[in-house]
Amino acid sequence: MPPETATNPKDARHDGWQTLKRFLPYLWPADNAVLRRRVVGAILMVLLGKATTLALPFAYKKAVDAMTLGGGAQPALTVALAFVLAYALGRFSGVLFDNLRNIVFERVGQDATRHLAENVFARLHKLSLRFHLARRTGEVTKVIERGTKSIDTMLYFLLFNIAPTVIELTAVIVIFWLNFGLGLVTATILAVIAYVWTTRTITEWRTHLREKMNRLDGQALARAVDSLLNYETVKYFGAESREEARYASAARAYADAAVKSENSLGLLNIAQALIVNLLMAGAMAWTVYGWSQGKLTVGDLVFVNTYLTQLFRPLDMLGMVYRTIRQGLIDMAEMFRLIDTHIEVADVPNAPALVVNRPSVTFDNVVFGYDRDREILHGLSFEVAAGSRVAIVGPSGAGKSTIARLLFRFYDPWEGRILIDGQDIAHVTQTSLRAALGIVPQDSVLFNDTIGYNIAYGRDGASRAEVDAAAKGAAIADFIARLPQGYDTEVGERGLKLSGGEKQRVAIARTLVKNPPILLFDEATSALDTRTEQDILSTMRAVASHRTTISIAHRLSTIADSDTILVLDQGRLAEQGSHLDLLRRDGLYAEMWARQAAESAEVSEAAE
């Protein structure tokens, strides 16, 4: 499992060995013997496949020697045919073992990648709201997407391309040493070293060229999209020629970079072919010379040629393999960087669950700000009695919505305490805390699923009867009944297929399914028209019965019947009392009420 605090790796982005070391437990899980057996089985298939491949040139050599030395006699023909059949069987066996290896290992690779992705996803849900507000959602999901896609390919190349090639190279060196001596061994080793060094050097250069090409491609696309999105502005100012020139400049830069990238590939292919063919020509010339001296046979020529061809065939892809492994390690490291991200708001060790008998809420001298250089709440203190209806109002920026975020413990206050039923919320589990709270926000976001799913989301395992009861309580049951598909009606992405009032009723029903003792309405009607607002307010009043309710509001008319109204001003409690008490004081609340009443009167006069 991922650590609860960051491990502060030196540099996960570039430390490939450290990244592989961290991934090893996913590939060799201590708690899954079946997957470990699959890994062993895949390795066994690799070894059997490579052993078969290494045996093929021997069969090829024996068949050729039988044909050239036997003079067509029946025994020689029989031997030659036998080795030809052995060669064919060996090739089939090589393909068989390779595919069996893939079949055996596929589950290992997929499970390892899945478990890593699951750990990253779980970690993301543990991170604070600050992290998610600071990072783009698409950026985070892209890290997971790239990581899961590249890990599988990287593992394939590491385990089934690089490792078998190293095994084959070692075996070829031993075979050449035993059969032909030091000269051919030295030439082969030097050629492989030159091949690998050249491929790595040119591939590094090509990677930089490719990155530049991709960056310029993005710039060209961005300029085109920006220009077309601002079509009217371009026309207003007659700037078509300027836009065309800007796009042409970006497209030209991209084309130049693309040409360099493709030319570099040609250079890589030429360099690789030069090294391989120099070795092949030298090795075969040396073998032909040995044949002319009577030391070697025609079969030895075929033997050497076949081994070198088999050896360099996987090396032909070395450039792509190197890039893929390099990118895979970077993508995997990015996933580990997410896992290593510090959890800002965490449960204290052995934290108990919150037990709510009397759902009171207390803010005790709370000091908080989203940034250390900007304090939002300045020693805020107030108490919400169990079963009461309390409203929080104030000018924009007074810290009203911050109270809801602190109560849900999306952030911890710098100083002071927040208590529910006398228990400090920082000392109880976050799961139990949030189970005691329900919220209907200003913009209720729904999942891209059915109405039934969104209502039942309030509590895991909610029954259909509970969903029906919640829909009736939120006064949306009749609307659902009129829909052709009823509860199975899709709401669309973020609930866009529903009106604002319908979305709010679904959100209220979802909260009713949760059935928390404390309810928060965070400007739940501010985005609705007046008629819909009144309907929703009636529903909210019914829902709030027998619960502790905190309503954060901008329009004062929606909370005038609250038991207590808290008036915030610049992060401090300026006033508190009932609606009539606050009007009699003629303070900030009375000023806000008079201003909103005047604005409402102006709107009414304009409508008439």
Swiss-Prot record:
TM region positions: 39-60, 83-105, 155-178, 180-202, 267-285, 301-322
Localization: Cell inner membrane
UniProt EC number: 7.-.-.-
Keyword field contains Transmembrane: yes
Segments in the Cytoplasmic topological domain: 1-38, 106-154, 203-266, 323-608
Top-level taxon of origin: Bacteria
SS bond partners: none
Subunit structure: Homodimer.
UniProt function note: Mediates the ATP-dependent export of glutathione-conjugated substrates, such as heavy metal-glutathione conjugates. ATP hydrolysis is stimulated by glutathione binding. Protects cells against toxic heavy metal ions, such as silver and mercury ions. May also mediate the transport of glutathione-conjugated aromatic hydrocarbons, such as dinitrobenzene.
Name the record gives this protein: ATM1-type heavy metal exporter
Organism expressing this protein natively: Novosphingobium aromaticivorans (strain ATCC 700278 / DSM 12444 / CCUG 56034 / CIP 105152 / NBRC 16084 / F199)
